[in-house]
Curated annotation (Swiss-Prot):
GO terms for biological process: division septum assembly; DNA repair; negative regulation of cell division; SOS response. Belongs to the YneA family. The gene is yneA. Residues 39-90 form the LysM domain. Coiled coil: none annotated. Gene3D superfamilies: LysM domain (3.10.350.10). This is Cell division suppressor protein YneA. The keyword DNA damage applies. Keywords: Cell cycle, Cell division, Cytoplasm, DNA damage, DNA repair, Septation, SOS response. Inhibits cell division during the SOS response. Affects a later stage of the cell division protein assembly, after the assembly of the Z ring, by probably suppressing recruitment of FtsL and/or DivIC to the division machinery.
Length: 109
């Protein structure tokens, strides 16, 4: 069989397989590209989402209201209620937290 005969007989299958491969690669790159390595913050007694936004919103380049809305959505929080001992993901890349200030003083210390 020559290539022309193979193409004439199986062109639909060949195009389908190539399309699936391309879409699979695009999907894989998209999924791997969205692993943003966002930071996780532990909630202490008396903390609120707005207090966390006051501290971290400037590092995320978001207004505080958008920051709080993002945290509520991504952490499945209802009405922004958090309790001590919880941890929430915030839209600040880990590298921005590491580069910002090497000495962090906790509120309860």
């Amino acid at each position: 069989m020559t290539l022309k005969l193979i193409w004439d007989k199986f062109y639909v299958s060949i195009i389908f397989v190539i399309t699936c491969l391309v879409l699979g690669i695009v999907l894989m790159c998209t999924v791997l590209g969205n692993s943003n390595n966002y930071s996780e913050v532990n909630i202490n007694e008396g903390d609120s989402l707005w207090a966390i936004a006051d501290e971290y919103a400037s590092k995320s380049d978001m207004p505080k209201a958008d920051f709080v809305a993002w945290v509520e959505k991504e952490n499945n929080l209802t009405e922004g209620h958090v309790k001590a001992g919880d941890s929430v993901v915030i839209p600040v890349h880990e590298t921005k937290l590491q580069n910002s200030d090497s000495t962090i003083q906790l509120a309860n210390q």
